[in-house]
A protein has these predicted regions:
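Extracytoplasmic thiol/disulfide redox context detector
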Residues: 2-99, 169, 173
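Cysteine-centric redox/oxidoreductase cores and disulfide-bonded domains
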Residues: 93-179, 184
C-alpha cells in the first residue's frame, strides 16, 4: 500500500506541476488541496478495471482546443510515470459529433494506428480546421494516413468499436465530468 500512496503522491504533485505550467501558479502542498474547490471525490468510486494500478483517466474531445494544447504535455508526462501508474485516454461523448470523434479514437486503437493518428486527428481539427463530422471525412483522413478504406469501414461498423464508445460515454457519466479536458485518478 505504501508504494501506491507514494505513486499517488507523485502523481498529484506531477499533475499540479503540469497544470501549473498551463494555468499559472498553484500551491503544491497536499494540505492546500480542498475538496470541492480543487477536486471532487466520486461517490460511488468509478471502477477502471486495472487492478492495483493507479489509473489517470483523461477525458478529452478532439474538438476541444484546451485538449489539443494539453495532449502533448500529458503524453510526455505519461511516459515518465512509475510502474503501476498509467494514463488511460477516454473520449467524452455528449452529442453526435463527439460520438463520431470517439469512434475515430477507437477505430485507430483497433487498427493499431492510435499512436500515429491520435495527434493527426487533433491537428486536422485545430490546424486544418476540418470538422470530421461524418464517416466519409474520417475515412478520408485515415486513408490519407495509410489506413486501408476497407479496414476502416469494417472497424467503423464493428460491434467492438460501438461497444467501446458506449463504455466511454458511461465512464464519463459515472465520473460526472462537465468539461474537457478532465482527469480522474
Amino acid at each position: 500500500m505504501t508504494g501506491i500512496r507514494q505513486t499517488f503522491t507523485t502523481l498529484v504533485l506531477t499533475l499540479t506541476a503540469v497544470f501549473g505550467s498551463v494555468t499559472g501558479p498553484v500551491a503544491i502542498a497536499e494540505d492546500r488541496w480542498t475538496e470541492g474547490q480543487h477536486y471532487q471525490t466520486l461517490t460511488p468510486p468509478v471502477a477502471v478495471g486495472r487492478g492495483s494500478d493507479v489509473v489517470v483517466t483523461e477525458f478529452f474531445w478532439y474538438g476541444c482546443g484546451h485538449c489539443y494544447t494539453f495532449e502533448p504535455m500529458l503524453t510526455a508526462w505519461g511516459k515518465q510515470l512509475p510502474d503501476g501508474a498509467v494514463v488511460q485516454p477516454s473520449p467524452a461523448v455528449w452529442n453526435d459529433p463527439m460520438r463520431m470523434h470517439a469512434k475515430a479514437y477507437y477505430i485507430a486503437e483497433v487498427l493499431g494506428v492510435k499512436e500515429t493518428l491520435h495527434p493527426v486527428v487533433f491537428d486536422a481539427m485545430h490546424v486544418q480546421r476540418k470538422r470530421l463530422a461524418s464517416r466519409l471525412e474520417l475515412r478520408d483522413l485515415f486513408e490519407d494516413n495509410g489506413v486501408d478504406p476497407a479496414q476502416f469501414n469494417k472497424a467503423f461498423d464493428s460491434f467492438g468499436v460501438d461497444s467501446q464508445v458506449r463504455q466511454a460515454d458511461a465512464r464519463a457519466r459515472s465520473a460526472k465530468i462537465s468539461g474537457t479536458p478532465s482527469l480522474m485518478v
